[in-house]
Design a protein with these regions (language model features):
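ASCE P-loop NTPase motor core, strongest for the SF2 helicase catalytic module
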Residues: 1-181
């Protein structure tokens, strides 16, 4: 199953997910040279805060190692996945919401499901998707909560010509309401 989700797990030279995610973060004003000038963006300009969702912890490892540690070391991030102790998850969420210097929160879709309030983020990136479209919608809703004052942009990275593209096409059709005559 992992190879269907990300060819990078099978052949490291074929996946552009870290590169694409890097470009989205740069477009959001995160991780570029402007982060290093005076430690932040210009005064009065709101910085974007990002939630990055992956279905598998292995893909979070790829994003963390190849994107943040190697390509974008100036990006500050936190991570929460199934191995995060349940007693520490609330503290991770509270810290991310309260500390505007943290640019990104990496999450697995399942740990970022019901009950979390992450309204400090205004950008959601799905690097890999859950086959159940409702789980992705629940994860997306973490940023679309009461109290959200900014527009939330959602990016879905899907590799063209893959089985994932076909499955996501079917999943989006299955999530549409049916009309009955």
């Amino acid at each position: 199953m992992s190879c269907l989700v990300s060819p990078y797990l099978r052949n490291q030279s074929t996946d552009n997910s870290p590169l694409l995610t890097s470009q989205i973060l740069l477009d959001c004003g995160i991780g570029g040279d402007s982060d290093q000038e005076d430690g932040a963006a210009e005064e009065g300009v709101a910085r974007h805060r990002v939630l990055i969702f992956c279905q598998l912890k292995q893909m979070l490892d790829i994003v963390e190692n190849d994107l943040f540690r190697k390509s974008m070391p100036s990006v500050t991030y936190m991570r929460m996945d199934g191995s995060t102790d349940v007693s520490k998850r609330h503290a991770v969420v509270q810290t991310f919401n309260a500390d505007p210097s943290i640019d990104v929160l990496l999450l697995t879709t399942h740990v970022g499901g019901l009950g979390l309030n992450l309204t400090s983020a205004d950008t959601v990136i799905f690097v890999e998707h859950d086959w159940n479209p409702m789980k992705d919608l629940q994860a997306m809703d973490r940023a679309h909560r009461l109290g959200q004052k900014r527009v939330v942009n959602v990016y879905r990275l899907i590799m063209r010509g893959t089985l994932e593209e076909k499955i996501m096409g079917c999943a989006s059709l299955s999530s549409l309401p049916t009309s009955r005559s």
